């Protein structure tokens, strides 16, 4: 008769092997879906582009990746900063003159539903379109004033900071490549 400890160990090993096998089997499909969604988001924030290629450059703090349009239409910068529940990932499109053409929150899955998720809606992100420099509405200085989202301060600040990081990255690149 086997001891309960040995039986439980065998069950755990079989379950772990099954989980690892499932992960290895589904990983290529998940990666393909994620890449397709990222490509669609890039087209959303820079609709005049005909395709994208990655840019090999030194990344600013918070910047995850940079893509340039293959037709010279502009650049898309993906950046992320901590919101209330976790990392908020934002994709920002710039035309060749450095004007923001679109902002899309690509991941805010850990933010509070109903509150933090408001910062992912076009009613918030569309404020950035057409700007070259931004600031929160209660700040002083140059730039387009951006209203925060009441009840979603952390999330709207994360989006704002991510867009500012994208602006800094675009400036570091010297504009569209």
For every predicted segment, state its role:
Residues 1-177:
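Flexible, solvent-exposed loop/hinge segments and secondary-structure transition points
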């Amino acid at each position: 008769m086997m001891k309960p400890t040995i039986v439980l160990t065998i069950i755990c090993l079989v379950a772990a092997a099954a989980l690892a096998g499932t992960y290895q089997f589904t990983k290529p499909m998940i990666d393909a879906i994620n890449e397709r969604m990222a490509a669609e988001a890039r087209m959303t924030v820079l609709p005049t582009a005909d395709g994208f290629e990655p840019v090999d450059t030194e990344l600013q703090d918070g910047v995850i990746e940079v893509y340039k349009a293959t037709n010279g239409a502009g650049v898309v910068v993906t950046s992320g900063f901590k919101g209330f529940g976790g990392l908020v990932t934002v994709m920002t499109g710039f035309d060749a003159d450095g004007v923001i053409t679109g902002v899309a929150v690509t991941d805010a899955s850990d933010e509070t539903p109903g509150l933090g998720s408001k910062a992912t809606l076009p009613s918030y992100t569309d404020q950035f379109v057409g700007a070259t420099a931004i600031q929160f509405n209660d700040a002083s200085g140059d730039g387009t004033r951006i209203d925060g989202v009441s009840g979603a301060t952390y999330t709207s600040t994360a989006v704002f900071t991510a867009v500012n990081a994208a602006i800094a990255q675009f400036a570091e690149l010297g504009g569209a490549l």
